[in-house]
C-alpha cells in the first residue's frame, strides 16, 4: 500500500502537490473550479488529476470532472456514489469505506507522480495568458485536486468528516465560497475549523454570482483583513460569474480562457510550498 508519507514528496526539482477543495456549503462552485483548474493545468503541461471521491444525488459533478480531464472513466474520478442526495454518512445501504477511499486516492497520487516524472526532461510552456514555464530549472509540480462533498465538517462515515480526508492525505485546503452577502462569516468559520484540526489553507476562491450584491465589492478585501495569520496562506482570489452554463462540460474550454489569468495566479501562488504533514487526527487542537 502506498502511504501518504511516501507521496508527500519534495525534491530539489520535482514535487507532487495535493489540494483538498472544500466549500462553505454545498452547491457553491467547487466542481466548476476544480474542473477548470484541472483543464488549465493539463493544457499547460502539468500532470494533474481531479477527483470527487464521494458523490451523492446525481452524477453531474462526476461527468464534469471526467470531461475536464478528457473522458476518464467514472472509476478514475469517483470512489463512492449514491443516488440519494444526502451526506455519505446518512446514505442507507452504502456504508463508506473511508480507508478504502484513502487507498484509492493514494493510488491516483502515485499515478500522477509517475506521469510527471515522465515529463522531467520537458519544459512546459503555456500558449495562453499566464502560461506556465519551468522556473530556474524546476520541473512543473504534479497536482492532485481532491474535491470534498459539502463543507469541511460534512460527515463521511462514523467519526470521519471531510476534514478527516484532508488530514489523512496531508493536503492543503482550497476553500471555495460564493461571493455574496454572508460569505465572510462562512469563510472565517471554515478556516478556523481547519486550523483547529491542523489543516493548512492554501487560498480562498470566491465564485461570482449571477446577481452580484453590494457585498461582492468588498468581500475579498474584508476576508483578507479578518483572516488570522496563516502559515502558507497564499491569498483570496475572485472568479467572475461564468453564466448559467458554467457547469456544462461542453463549455470547459471556453470558460478556461475566460478565467485563464486568475487560474494562473492561483497556480503560481500555491505551487511553491513545503511538503504537507500527515497523520493528524480529526480533533480540534489547543
Predicted feature residues:
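Short internal beta-strands
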Residues: 50-52, 174-177, 202-208
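Phosphate-binding/switch loop-helix module in NTP-utilizing enzymes
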Residues: 88-118, 137-156
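Glycine-rich phosphate-binding P-loop
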Residues: 21-34
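Charged helix-capping and loop-helix junction motifs
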Residues: 157-165, 188-191, 216-222
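Intrinsically disordered, low-complexity terminal tails and inter-domain linkers enriched
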Residues: 2-15, 106, 110-142, 272-286
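Inter-motif core of Ras-like GTPase G domains
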Residues: 159-179
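N-terminal phosphate/diphosphate-binding loop that engages ATP/GTP or pyrophosphate donors
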Residues: 32-99, 104-108
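C-terminal lobe/tail of nucleotide-utilizing enzymes
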Residues: 192-286
Amino acid at each position: 500500500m502506498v502511504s501518504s508519507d511516501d507521496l508527500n514528496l519534495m525534491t530539489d526539482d520535482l514535487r507532487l502537490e495535493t489540494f483538498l477543495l472544500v466549500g462553505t456549503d454545498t452547491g457553491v462552485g467547487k466542481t466548476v473550479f476544480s474542473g477548470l483548474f484541472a483543464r488549465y493545468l493539463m493544457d499547460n503541461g502539468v500532470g494533474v488529476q481531479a477527483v470527487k471521491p464521494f458523490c451523492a444525488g446525481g452524477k453531474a459533478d462526476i461527468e464534469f470532472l471526467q470531461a475536464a480531464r478528457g473522458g476518464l472513466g467514472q472509476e478514475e474520478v469517483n470512489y463512492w456514489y449514491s443516488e440519494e442526495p444526502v451526506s455519505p454518512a446518512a446514505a442507507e445501504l452504502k456504508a463508506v469505506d473511508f480507508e478504502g477511499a484513502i487507498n484509492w486516492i493514494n493510488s491516483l497520487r502515485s499515478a500522477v507522480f509517475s506521469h510527471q516524472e515522465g515529463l522531467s526532461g520537458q519544459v512546459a510552456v503555456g500558449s495562453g495568458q499566464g502560461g506556465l514555464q519551468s522556473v530556474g530549472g524546476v520541473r512543473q509540480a504534479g497536482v492532485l485536486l481532491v474535491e470534498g462533498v459539502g463543507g469541511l465538517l460534512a460527515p463521511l462515515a462514523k467519526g470521519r468528516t471531510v476534514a478527516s480526508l484532508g488530514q489523512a492525505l496531508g493536503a492543503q485546503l482550497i476553500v471555495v465560497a460564493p461571493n455574496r452577502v454572508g460569505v465572510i462569516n462562512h469563510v472565517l468559520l471554515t478556516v478556523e475549523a481547519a486550523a483547529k484540526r491542523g489543516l493548512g489553507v492554501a487560498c480562498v476562491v470566491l465564485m461570482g454570482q449571477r446577481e452580484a450584491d453590494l457585498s461582492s465589492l468588498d468581500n475579498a478585501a474584508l476576508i483578507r483583513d479578518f483572516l488570522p495569520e496563516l502559515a502558507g496562506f497564499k491569498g483570496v482570489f475572485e472568479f467572475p460569474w461564468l453564466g448559467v452554463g458554467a457547469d456544462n462540460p461542453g463549455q470547459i474550454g471556453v470558460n478556461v480562457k475566460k478565467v485563464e489569468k486568475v487560474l494562473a495566479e492561483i497556480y503560481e501562488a500555491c505551487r511553491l510550498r513545503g511538503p504537507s504533514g500527515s497523520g493528524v487526527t480529526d480533533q480540534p487542537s489547543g
